């Protein structure tokens, strides 16, 4: 009897310990530096790939931006089938169309070349094509799935960090909501960070994607699942963004600033992929899907308000964020002010009312935010009424 009791106690302790275990994972290979896109063919060849399905931003392809990628594949004798991705955030109908084309072409791997929307779509495609009996809506982070197709991710904006995360966000065609799926299989095999590909990104897009990266870093640093690994990446990314984003927005051909932003975006992605995000993302997904506004802009409109809500449980962490942004002694309020000032400096200091949001939206949006997986790692619990109030405060 005593042995049974002892075993039960140890099992209980083991269960409690497992609940405290935190993970940290990054892609196996990350290449960076101007011109690094030329390494894509070698990376594909190393993995034994013969025919790649290239999902590329349609505008970038038309502008000739995929030429270097094409050359690197041709030199290695690797065939490619091009799939121009539609403009805007990925919808499940577009993803399913790409899956059908990939199956028909017989490709053995995928390259994603574009912004976060293209990368998210490609991640979903690689998973769905090898799991034909499952839908994204049915999948969860604990789903047992067949291995996805090999994936090489080449971001052309500095923001989502999708090239280094285990997350994809796809708009459901029926509900209009954003489906957020986190799964270990969604982590790309290779991330190629070539800052030269980001030089032509318009200033307003640079600003929005940059604030998205800042939001990733701040939420990862504040998250319940933060670890020393993710803390180092997140606070480093915050400092880099504070220094480099105004330069990248103001002078797009500043390659050093562009590269710094691309690295910061990647670091923030690594951080939140393990630590999680928070209430700002849970809330931002709703107006983004309903009003079709860019994700980075939605984050910019909500981040200071959500930080004020979380401040009571994040005082020391916010003080460190303030120091990272202002390079001087700061308190928690200074951090929120510094974030607001940076958002205004890069020209996207808008309110929800400016993009068509009204109080009639807030109840449904708040309910959807409560169901968003990003909320799980927020440092402070939020009720439906509190989230409605936060939307109203950002009006």
Curated annotation (Swiss-Prot):
Its cofactor is Fe cation. One of its GO terms (molecular function) is metal ion binding. The keyword Ubl conjugation does not apply. It is an enzyme of class 1 (oxidoreductase). GO terms for biological process: ethanolamine catabolic process. It is found in: Bacterial microcompartment. InterPro entries: ADH_Fe/GldA, ADH_Fe_C, ADH_Fe_CS, Alcohol_dehydrogenase_Fe. It catalyses: ethanol + NAD(+) = acetaldehyde + NADH + H(+). Its EC number is 1.1.1.1. Keywords: Bacterial microcompartment, Iron, Metal-binding, NAD, Oxidoreductase. Pfam families: ADH_Fe_C, Fe-ADH. Its main location: other. Fe cation binds at residues 212, 216, 281, 295. PROSITE patterns: ADH_IRON_1 (PS00913), ADH_IRON_2 (PS00060). NAD(+) binds at residues 57, 116-120, 156-160, 178, 197-201, 295, 354. The keyword Oxidoreductase applies. Pathway: Amine and polyamine degradation; ethanolamine degradation. Belongs to the iron-containing alcohol dehydrogenase family. May act on the acetaldehyde produced from the degradation of ethanolamine, producing ethanol. Active on acetaldehyde and isobutyraldehyde in vitro. In vitro works equally well with NADH or NADPH. This is Probable alcohol dehydrogenase EutG.
């Amino acid at each position: 009897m005593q042995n049974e009791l002892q075993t039960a106690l140890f099992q209980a302790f083991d269960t409690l310990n497992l609940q405290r275990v935190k993970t940290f994972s990054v892609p196996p290979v990350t290449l960076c530096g101007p011109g690094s896109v030329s390494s894509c063919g070698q990376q594909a060849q190393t993995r034994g790939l013969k025919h790649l399905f290239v999902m590329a931003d349609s505008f970038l392809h038309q502008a000739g931006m995929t030429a270097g990628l094409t050359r690197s594949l041709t030199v290695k004798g690797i065939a490619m089938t091009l799939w121009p991705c539609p403009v805007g955030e990925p919808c499940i109908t577009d993803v399913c169309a790409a899956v059908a084309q990939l199956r028909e072409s017989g490709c053995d791997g995928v390259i994603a070349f574009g912004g976060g929307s293209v990368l998210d779509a490609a991640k979903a495609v690689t998973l769905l094509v090898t799991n034909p009996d499952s839908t994204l809506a049915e999948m969860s982070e604990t789903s047992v799935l067949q291995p996805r197709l090999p994936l090489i991710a080449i971001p052309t904006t500095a923001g989502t960090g999708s090239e280094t995360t285990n997350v994809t966000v796809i708009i459901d065609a029926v509900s209009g909501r954003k489906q957020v799926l986190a799964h270990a299989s969604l982590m790309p095999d290779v991330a190629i960070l070539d800052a030269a590909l980001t030089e032509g990104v318009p200033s307003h897009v640079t600003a929005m994607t940059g604030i998205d990266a800042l939001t990733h870093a701040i939420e990862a640093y504040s998250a319940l699942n933060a670890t020393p690994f993710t803390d180092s990446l997140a606070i480093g990314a915050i400092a880099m963004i504070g220094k480099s984003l105004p330069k990248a927005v103001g002078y797009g051909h500043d390659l050093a600033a562009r590269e710094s932003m691309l690295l910061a975006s990647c670091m923030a992605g690594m951080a939140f992929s393990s630590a999680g995000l928070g209430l700002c993302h849970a809330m931002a997904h709703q107006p983004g899907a309903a009003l079709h506004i860019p994700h980075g802009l939605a984050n910019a409109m909500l981040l200071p308000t959500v930080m004020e809500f979380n401040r009571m449980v994040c005082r020391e962490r916010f003080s460190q964020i303030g120091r990272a942004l202002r390079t001087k002694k700061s308190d928690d309020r200074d951090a929120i002010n510094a974030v607001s000032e940076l958002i205004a400096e890069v020209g996207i200091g808008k309110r929800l009312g400016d993009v068509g949001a009204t109080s009639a939206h807030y109840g449904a949006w708040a309910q959807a935010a409560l169901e968003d997986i990003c909320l799980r790692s927020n440092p402070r619990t939020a009720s439906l009424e509190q989230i409605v109030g936060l939307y109203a405060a950002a009006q």
